């Protein structure tokens, strides 16, 4: 109900046995990019529109910028207390709390001030630290900030991943699996037609320093096994 085309830049998250898919869409009535949400009983789908309307539309963020593509790249994080947060943005980073139903905002949209933020926010937590990673500048590197609270204030920590091969763009995810941490990103390594918008998914190991900061990613051709 919210869109005609441009379904990309998305994330699926599970809550109470339901799978919620947050996705960037092109709104059919309100100019600019929007964020919609669909729901399914399975991560494989089928997904159906959970609201009948967009969750975020471009007219909700005009105070910060007049561009029509700032409302993209949604990511969801459910904190230890059960509160869910939606982060998103291009050139400007935003967050908002979600209600328990996962399809309505529960409070105002908040702007997050990050150095040289371009797009692709991602939240993860390790111990008592929250990490906000994002694509920075163009061509895009992945940078990150840390905080003791998911709502900040955020302390910038620098570059996590340099420009990936043959790609001006990048978009990351950071996950823990069986006690190890992994950095998921893309490059343009597909031969012979790979590039910024024909991308290969890459996975490499992520390591932490004793103070909780993250070590710079060592990109490999082989990935992980």
Regions picked out by a protein language model, each given a short descriptive name:
Residues 8-31, 66, 73-94, 122-136, ...:
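Hydrophobic core segments of beta-strands in well-ordered, beta-rich domains
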Residues 38-45, 97-105, 144-152, 207-214:
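Short loop/turn segments immediately following beta-strands, especially the blade-tip
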Residues 116-154, 158, 167-170:
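Loop/turn-rich, solvent-exposed surfaces of beta-rich toroidal or solenoidal domains
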Residues 30-78:
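Asp-box/WD-like beta-propeller blade repeats and closely related beta-sheet repeat scaffolds
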Residues 1-6:
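Short, small-residue-biased leader/transition segments that mark boundaries at the very start
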Residues 30-36, 92-99, 140-145, 192-203:
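Structural motif
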Residues 65-69, 111-116, 162-165:
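Surface loop/turn motifs at the tips and blade-to-blade linkers of beta-strand repeat domains
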Residues 48-55, 106-113, 155-161, 215-222:
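Beta-propeller fold detector
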């Amino acid at each position: 109900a919210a869109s005609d085309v441009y379904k990309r830049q998305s994330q699926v998250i599970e809550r109470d046995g339901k799978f919620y898919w947050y996705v960037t869409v092109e709104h059919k009535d309100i100019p600019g990019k929007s964020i919609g949400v669909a729901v399914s009983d399975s991560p494989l789908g089928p997904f159906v529109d959970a609201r009948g309307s967009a969750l975020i539309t471009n007219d909700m963020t005009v105070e910060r910028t007049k561009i029509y593509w700032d409302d993209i790249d949604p990511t969801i994080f459910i904190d230890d207390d059960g509160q869910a947060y939606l982060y998103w943005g291009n050139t400007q980073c935003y967050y908002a709390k979600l209600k328990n139903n996962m399809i309505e905002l529960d409070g105002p949209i908040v702007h997050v001030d990050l150095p040289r933020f371009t797009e692709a926010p991602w939240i993860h937590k390790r111990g008592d630290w929250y990490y906000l990673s994002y694509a920075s500048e163009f061509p895009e590197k992945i940078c990150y900030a840390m905080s003791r609270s998911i709502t900040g204030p955020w302390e910038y920590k620098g570059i996590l991943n340099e420009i990936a091969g043959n790609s001006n763009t990048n978009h990351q995810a950071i996950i823990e699996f069986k006690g190890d941490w992994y950095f998921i990103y893309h490059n343009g390594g597909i031969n012979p037609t790979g590039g910024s918008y024909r991308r290969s998914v890459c996975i490499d190991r992520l390591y932490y320093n004793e103070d909780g900061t993250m070590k710079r990613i060592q990109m490999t051709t082989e990935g992980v096994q």
